[in-house]
Amino acid sequence: MVFQQFNLFPHLTAGENVMLAVKVVKKMGDADAERLAQQMLDKVGLAEKFDAYPERLSGGQQQRVAIARALAMSPKVLLCDEITSALDPELVNEVLAVVKQLASEGMTLVMVTHEMRFAREVGSKLVFMHHGKVHEVGDPRQLFANPQTAELQHFVGSVSL
């Protein structure tokens, strides 16, 4: 799972942050964990940041390290909870580009997001919730083009797509 707050350990480098879970949970050896961390950082466009500490990374880079850390565990489904909400607007696209690439590679993603253009473009199924209640479920293009509930109609009318 990837959260809106990156939750990187500040005393560990990007590579060490990615390596930690596979070493502790999967009991992977140092050399294999380092190779895997390098591969995952490369996958999110941060191969050159292996030895960088979180304080030296932008918010978007920190979020991509968090994504690499999650991917290192070989999940069947990647859960993303508002992963762009804590980012400066100019950094959002770099994170969304990584998620879009993962989706195109067949990764199953469950995302909580307010990035409606992204949800419409990349999603295969959208669940619209309002005040903790599911109001509509379906194809994103259909839901945005023809919302059935008053809540979704109001929401679609209030956001720019």
Task: Label every model-predicted segment.
Residues 128-131, 137, 141-161:
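C-terminal boundary and immediately downstream tail of ABC-type ATPase nucleotide-binding domains
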Residues 1-140:
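ABC family nucleotide-binding domain
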